[in-house]
């Protein structure tokens, strides 16, 4: 019913919408909206596929399949990461970055981050973080998974993604507290993933790498901070580009959270946008909300550099980078409330089950939901996999 509502609102709004596509849009309005709806169809297909696999394999085998995919992605990402340190060929990269023009990895005086085969380091972390609880569920049965779990955790740490690290720590802590209160018994194994993450952070310190500065003769035309690596915009920029992984991740968290939620730049931008717009009851439709947001985003993020107005993502369709805000503008208060009620019922059911498997799937889901505050705006493959695994838990019950 929820996905049907999203689809209906989008189709109704699309019929009466007069599209004004950004300059660098790569598809027509019809194609763009169709892709949004196809994404919903793909989301349903993944849930169905995971559930259908249970007709051929037991639950733990399905989780092993998913975890092995995560291990493989992690290993490939680490190979890519070390290619810049030990100077061997990285994988071919032919897709644009978030800025739209190139995927910048090797930049003078910038710290090396683990991209893997993704467009952004945070995309890699968002994809891997939900798999960590599944790995440690398997580790309760076979100790070898403790060792294998180091690979995705190290890959996340070297991505230096605050979204991945914060969501993983808070998600597991939240689930651990709830299960401790419910069972009146603290299980140390529940927080082992956090211990592994902290350990990997210190290991990652020895694997940090900063690209060397350019020759001084190249500045100008290049900016001074590319020829002198001791120049930083502020303390946050200094922490971000520190070779120390611990400083890069955890000091940045401290500096950002001092400013409250508005310390996260994207949330600050979204707060300003919400305050400008009328209350959304039924929403603007999937994709259409992004088209409406893009001009305002340009206005909110433009900068005056030496008397010239510079836009962050000129001529592009901009992402909300927040699922909940995207749902609010795409499907209105009605759609957002339906989604939150659905999630609450799922989490409540897992909590009431209270068993070991429910804990790890609960953690998996909470990690995903936390990441949606800071990264990604669409119903993702990992969320579909998580819901599919939950259906296996509820297979003989009415969800």
Which residues make up each language-model segment?
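Transmembrane signal-anchor hairpin modules in multi-pass inner-membrane enzymes, especially those
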Residues: 1-18, 64, 143, 185-190, ...
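N-terminal hydrophobic segments of proteins, predominantly signal-anchor/transmembrane helices
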Residues: 1-46, 366-368
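Membrane-interface micro-motifs in multi-pass membrane enzymes
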Residues: 36, 100-103, 111-128, 319-323, ...
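Alpha-helical transmembrane segments of multi-pass inner-membrane proteins
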Residues: 63-93, 105-110, 115-181
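Long extracytoplasmic/lumenal interhelical loops at the membrane interface
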Residues: 102, 254-331
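Transmembrane alpha-helices of multi-pass inner-membrane enzymes
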Residues: 172-173, 186-193, 342, 360-399
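Hydrophobic transmembrane alpha-helices and their immediate junctions
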Residues: 173-177, 181, 185-186, 316, ...
């Amino acid at each position: 019913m929820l996905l049907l509502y999203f689809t209906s609102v989008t189709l109704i709004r699309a019929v009466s919408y007069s599209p004004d596509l950004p300059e660098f849009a790569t598809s027509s309005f019809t194609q763009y909206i169709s892709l949004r709806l196809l994404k919903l169809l793909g989301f349903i297909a993944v849930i169905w596929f995971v559930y259908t696999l249970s007709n051929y394999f037991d639950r733990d085998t399905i989780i092993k399949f998913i975890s092995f995919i995560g291990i493989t992605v992690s290993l490939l990402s680490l190979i890519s990461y070390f290619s810049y340190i030990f100077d061997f060929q990285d994988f071919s990269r032919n897709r644009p970055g978030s800025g739209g023009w190139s995927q910048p990895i090797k930049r003078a005086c910038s710290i090396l981050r683990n991209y893997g085969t993704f467009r952004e380091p945070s995309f890699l972390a968002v994809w891997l973080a939900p798999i960590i609880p599944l790995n440690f569920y398997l580790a309760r049965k076979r100790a070898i998974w403790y060792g294998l779990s180091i690979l995705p955790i190290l890959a996340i740490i070297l991505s230096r993604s605050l979204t991945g690290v914060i969501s993983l720590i808070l998600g597991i802590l939240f689930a651990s507290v709830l299960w401790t209160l419910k069972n009146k018994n603290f299980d140390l194994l529940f927080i082992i993933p956090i211990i592994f993450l902290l350990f990997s952070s210190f290991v990652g310190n020895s694997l940090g790498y900063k690209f060397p500065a350019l020759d001084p003769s190249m500045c100008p035309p290049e900016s001074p901070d590319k020829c002198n690596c001791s120049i930083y915009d502020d303390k946050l920029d200094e922490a971000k580009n520190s070779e120390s992984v611990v400083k890069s991740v955890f000091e940045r968290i401290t500096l950002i959270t001092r400013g409250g939620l508005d310390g996260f730049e994207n949330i600050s931008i979204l707060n300003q946008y919400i305050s400008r717009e009328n209350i959304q009851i039924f929403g603007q439709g999937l994709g259409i909300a992004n088209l409406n947001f893009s001009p305002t985003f340009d206005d909110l993020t433009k900068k005056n550099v030496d008397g010239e107005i510079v836009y962050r993502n000129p001529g592009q369709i901009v992402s909300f980078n927040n699922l909940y805000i995207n749902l609010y503008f795409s499907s209105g208060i009605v759609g957002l409330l339906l989604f939150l009620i659905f999630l609450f019922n799922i989490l409540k059911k897992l909590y009431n089950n209270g068993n070991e498997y429910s804990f790890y799937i609960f953690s998996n889901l909470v990690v995903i939901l936390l990441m949606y505050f800071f990264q990604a705006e669409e119903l993702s493959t990992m969320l579909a996999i998580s819901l599919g695994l939950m259906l296996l838990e509820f297979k003989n019950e009415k969800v």
